[in-house]
Amino acid sequence: MSEERKPLAVVEDRIELAASPEVLWTCFADLSKWPAWFPALVEAKWTSGSPWAIGAQFRQTLKFGFPLGRLTATAVIVEISPSPYVAWEWKVAGMEAIHGYRFDAAVGGTDVLSRHEFYGFPAFLARVFFLTRRMHRIYQAALQGFKAYVETGTIQLRMPM
């Protein structure tokens, strides 16, 4: 994640899953399956570069509901490591975001960290108007959906309010 500047809003969640980091990374790395477990995600597809390589790009369309609406952005992979850890950034409508996921081995499975940093005036407004709480619920639902997808093969597509 970014250490040079301070984000105006941060949303961070963790969840433990009963699978190895390698199994989770294999499931997570299939970008075409993201809409199956991430309720706010409409579409995600690679647009350039080798998947999961620095500089590779993918387009994602998210629906956040009122007042955030629908957002389409091109994400660029900015960091990846074998732990596994991956981070990407996107810029749209005056806001920049850096999203990262880390998969750490734990007793009985893996601890998954989801961290989202937001920069720019829209991020400030989101914090002022308590929209980060809504974003927290959205990303928490994504982790719960990922857990259900990995552990039981079921899909949870309920958008949190």
Predicted regions and their residues:
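Hydrophobic ligand-binding cavity/cleft-lining segments
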Residues: 1-49, 53, 161
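Hydrophobic-ligand binding "helix-grip"
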Residues: 5, 35, 61-113, 117-122, ...
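A conserved amphipathic terminal alpha-helix motif
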Residues: 118-161
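Short coil-to-beta transition motif at edge beta-strands of beta-rich domains
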Residues: 52-60
